[in-house]
């Protein structure tokens, strides 16, 4: 199905069904069309049917869950892991605002530890964030958006003075750390394009050496 990857990452991620099965209690509230609905589960089993419990002026879903201590030896939530993921999501979804609040940690003024993540320029700001401690080789981030077979594709990239390749690839917000055809296709396309430009400009004649894809990716940072 050519349309599968419009909504799927092609990976077996941990979704709400998995969280539900591994929680002694999961409480879900849904605000929709002026009404508030609620349902509770225990170890994946509904405790009662979905119930309309009131009215609401909002739209959205609130999920509260308690991990099953008989399965998890330790269930301590680490701020840095959650903050890094929400920061990543804010870059991948330009314009949205995500807030992380830790009610275990109280500030001197009585408020809870909290951080807001928001990015107006998305992937461009993501690349700037990744490369903030590196010396740039070009002034501006290269940003490309296109669509193929109804599936949107977005790339932001730049070069720095290091010798390392630093590429982060995602499918529908999922970090595809093991790569995939989207990543190998990008690498091939980049090599083909830059090599053709170098040949047309007769740059390679002066060097008298064979240029590989690795050479074109030295100092590259891309998302």
Describe each model-derived feature in a short phrase.
Residues 80, 88-89, 95, 99-223:
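GHKL/Histidine-kinase-like ATPase module
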């Amino acid at each position: 199905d050519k349309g599968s990857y419009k909504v799927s990452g092609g990976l077996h991620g941990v979704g709400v069904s998995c969280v539900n099965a591994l929680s002694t209690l999961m409480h879900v509230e849904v605000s929709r069309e002026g009404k508030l609905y609620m349902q509770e589960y225990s170890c994946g089993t509904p405790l009662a049917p979905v119930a309309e419990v009131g009215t609401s002026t909002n739209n959205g879903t609130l999920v509260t869950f308690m991990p099953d201590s008989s399965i998890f030896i330790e269930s301590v939530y680490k701020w840095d892991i959650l903050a890094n993921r929400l920061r990543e999501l804010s870059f991948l979804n330009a314009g949205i605002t995500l807030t992380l609040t830790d009610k275990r940690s109280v500030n001197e003024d009585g408020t809870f530890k909290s951080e807001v993540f928001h990015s107006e320029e998305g992937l461009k700001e993501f690349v700037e964030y990744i490369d903030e401690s590196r010396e740039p080789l070009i002034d501006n981030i290269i940003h490309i958006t296109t669509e193929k077979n109804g599936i949107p594709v977005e790339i932001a990239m730049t070069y720095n003075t290091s010798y390392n390749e630093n590429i982060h690839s995602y499918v529908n917000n999922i970090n595809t750390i093991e790569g995939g055809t989207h990543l190998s296709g990008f690498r091939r396309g980049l090599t083909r394009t830059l090599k053709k430009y170098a040949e047309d400009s007769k740059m390679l004649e002066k060097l008298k050496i064979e240029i590989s894809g690795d050479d074109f990716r030295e100092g590259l940072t891309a998302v």
